Amino acid sequence: MKHIVKQIHFVGIGGAGMSGIAEVLVNLGYEVSGSDLSRNAVTDRLEALGARIAIGHDAANIAGANAVVVSTAVRSDNPEVLAARHQGVPIVQRAVMLAELMRLKQGIAIAGTHGKTTTTSLVASVLAAGGLDPTFVIGGRLISAGANARLGTGDFIVAEADESDASFLNLYPVIEVITNIDADHMDTYGHDFARLKQAFIEFTQRLPFYGSAVVCVDDPNVRQIIPFISKPVVRYGLSPDAQVRAEDIDARDGRMHFTVIREGRAPLAVVLNLPGLHNVQNALAAIAIATDLGVSDDAIQQALAEFNGVGRRFQRYGEVPSADGGQYTLIDDYGHHPVEMAATVAAARGAFPGRRLVLAFQPHRYTRTRDCFDDFVNVLSTVDALVLTEVYAAGEAAIATANGDALSRALRAVGKVDPVFVASVDDVPDALAGVARNGDVVITMGAGSIGGVPAKIVQNTQQKE
């Protein structure tokens, strides 16, 4: 590709999905430019690596580009997209560019409605511990690497495969993981769940005859598609028929202790430096792949025990002073679908037994809030105290029956929790100050702007000291 394409421009380069690909291309020696609406730590990092960053979208930003990379979040009337079309510069979807990177190495693609980022990070970490030095492109910041992407010298590239816009069908990896299949982003599939499941079947058809589909048999929807997968299947999970399964699971001190049972191998005692049964399942996917690729058991054990996590995935910010003179534990999480949220709440209960759980939640997208309204009410009713914000629109038009006020009224009608509603996410720190008590576990949660709240809370605390 390099002898034809020398300069590549990214529209929305600061996004999690775009920035990782951009970083790998910079490290491969391409000239990379990009634009975004505001600066952040990601754009600063890319600029330090040599990328040319512009703040704001303007036709002049694509000067000299041989290709313009966009995601489905970029509107067709974006001035840079219009300029590229006018100048005859190829407009490339993000997933297509990721597919080009996979052509350079052997691809390991992690798919599923929930758990992609953590599973991708675990796979990359375990393979790195085994000396395979993989390239990785992750939708979140791998804390141990300080980045969401890295160019390795090994044969493999590990990346997330996004089903939200069906773009994962552009990828042709040699190993695929399917963590689960749930009803999300249903507008892509005409609100037809059968079409969503069919897309995952088609995803497995991208595998070569020597490839493998590593699938979680604990998920009933994944189990249903297994008979339609024509390539070799490796089953993992907690179920008795899993070829790589966990037994003797014990949650202690925020870690998961369990024994891995693999066909033809001795049992392996593992300590995972993450809480929650869902993370045991994510780790099993990494163990299955690592075992297949010849990573030693010692390396697997070390990588999982030392795993530092991913930014915004049950990320601990430590102890914060509470208004009553004590301290509470502050955690941030990206969960925005009721299934993910329930898993995180369960993980928090297991990691901090007997402690009061306070949640500050920002719903993400009006359509998701509408489609999963009852499920949101159910999972939010399981916490001890709740601060609720208005929905983060993500470009959608407001829906009066699926906004923060409607959710608050529904929660009060159930009567298990009385939410403190704030119209703006900027008001969350003050609202939490009035709710959190000594010994509480406080989780900020959502896929929108609430991700900046924990740092503000910590900053406010430091200014008062």
UniProtKB/Swiss-Prot annotation:
Keywords: ATP-binding, Cell cycle, Cell division, Cell shape, Cell wall biogenesis/degradation, Cytoplasm, Ligase, Nucleotide-binding, Peptidoglycan synthesis. It catalyses: UDP-N-acetyl-alpha-D-muramate + L-alanine + ATP = UDP-N-acetyl-alpha-D-muramoyl-L-alanine + ADP + phosphate + H(+). Its EC number is 6.3.2.8. It is an enzyme of class 6 (ligase). One of its GO terms (biological process) is cell wall organization. ATP binds at residues 112-118. Pathway: Cell wall biogenesis; peptidoglycan biosynthesis. Its main location: cytoplasm. One of its GO terms (cellular component) is cytoplasm. GO terms for molecular function: ATP binding; UDP-N-acetylmuramate-L-alanine ligase activity. It comes from the Bacteria. It is found in: Cytoplasm. It holds the Pfam family Mur_ligase. PANTHER family: UDP-N-ACETYLMURAMATE--L-ALANINE LIGASE, UDP-N-ACETYLMURAMATE--L-ALANINE LIGASE-RELATED. Cell wall formation. Belongs to the MurCDEF family. This is UDP-N-acetylmuramate--L-alanine ligase. It comes from Burkholderia ambifaria (strain MC40-6). The lineage of its organism: Bacteria, Pseudomonadati, Pseudomonadota, Betaproteobacteria, Burkholderiales. The gene is murC.
